[in-house]
């Protein structure tokens, strides 16, 4: 199978044990430069809060810095968790980004808080209900449009006026897929950590897709699917490096709060269920190519967005390089 669909990167700005948030951010910017040189299509930053191992909290600031050190790659949010933000502020922030960096900015929007309940309450700014979410998107599009004025209020956002920042809907379930389809917007599926509803979510998105919605901006359904990827020179080395992510998800389930851990002997995970990490491509370039081929054939995805965790930033960058070699 000829791999021809765009390939992108989702970065959560990991903080390895013994390092700092500053070092994690610096490593992410170096990876951004590399991805740009290698021809990746997008670089998106996630939004997470109250986590010791991730520094992707102020997403718009990370986007601005990454855009300033790159030239061609699209840079955006994967995504802004809208319940945490006033929609007007989102319009003003991403309008400013578009003014600073031109037509390379994407705005991915999600309904989840991206954190625990206590932190979500501290951050809460808008409703996560589907109807409110749809209205916020409608207003954001208007703030990015010719008038710069929302549909639901006469408030003007001059900094976002005319910027036409593309909006994506993020989701991990059939419900999220249905919302994206009904809104007539591209859909980014979080299959890299939520594998259970992949096939149904993609089907529902395509079946519910409508170009008649006032929010519709594309003519045909567009799916970007997430997948964990670690490429190394050998299958054995890739499996060893993958244990960093496996430990992270074990920590998540156990409620253990610590930074990203170094790899361990893969035998510690022998026979264990992949669980949330089922959608992963791990191995040598030849192995990963076959796994990606299979995933693209299964999903019919129009684009892949890859997530790579590694304790050592050099290992992550080597994976990004090897993946580019087999893809481009």
PLM feature segments, named:
Residues 7-11, 43-45, 75-77, 105-109, ...:
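Hydrophobic faces of well-ordered beta-strands that scaffold small-molecule active sites
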